[in-house]
Curated annotation (Swiss-Prot):
It comes from the Eukaryota. It holds the Pfam family NTF3_N. Glycans are attached at N112. Seems to promote the survival of visceral and proprioceptive sensory neurons. One of its GO terms (molecular function) is nerve growth factor receptor binding. GO terms for cellular component: axon; dendrite; extracellular space; synaptic vesicle. This is Neurotrophin-3. Keywords: Cleavage on pair of basic residues, Glycoprotein, Growth factor, Secreted, Signal. It comes from Calabaria reinhardtii. SUPFAM superfamilies: Cystine-knot cytokines. The gene is NTF3. Belongs to the NGF-beta family. GO terms for biological process: cell surface receptor protein tyrosine kinase signaling pathway; modulation of chemical synaptic transmission; negative regulation of neuron apoptotic process; nerve development; nerve growth factor signaling pathway; neuron projection morphogenesis. Residues 1-3 form the signal peptide. It is found in: Secreted.
Amino acid sequence: IQSTSMDQGSLTEDSMNSFIRTLIQAGIWKNKVPKQTARTKDGMQTTVKRTKAEAEAVASEGTRLGFQPVVLVDAELLRQQRRFSSPRVLLSENTPLEPPPLYLMEEPAVLNRTSRRKRYAEGKSHRGEYSVCDSESRWVTDKSSAVDIRGHQVTVLGEIRMGPS
């Protein structure tokens, strides 16, 4: 699989998850070959472990050649996944003609990551603050009645008793 940088649409989480699931099933996720499966009498799939001899043969072959086995990707798998367009990765059957451009080095805004502008809200927010008393610029301590936010006359309690009476 070759990857190149592209600026195409964005991926939804569901489409990316199904694509990763397809890669895992195809055995190309993290260069792993899928485990062999067998069906039991009741139709359930079970994983068949490799014998010790098979595991040693695969391990010695990899060390003898000096590299991990390469998993071939079927072109049909790539054709099925064309709908997964990512702004960063493109699955392609062809080798890229040139290295990907370095977008981050060209953008001057990214070079100075410490300079950030603060967002300021316009005006002072008074959400959740309601006045029970008449509007005055000083504390009112001698009032026995007031007008609430709905315009009703209410009695101001001078003392609030809490606990058992």
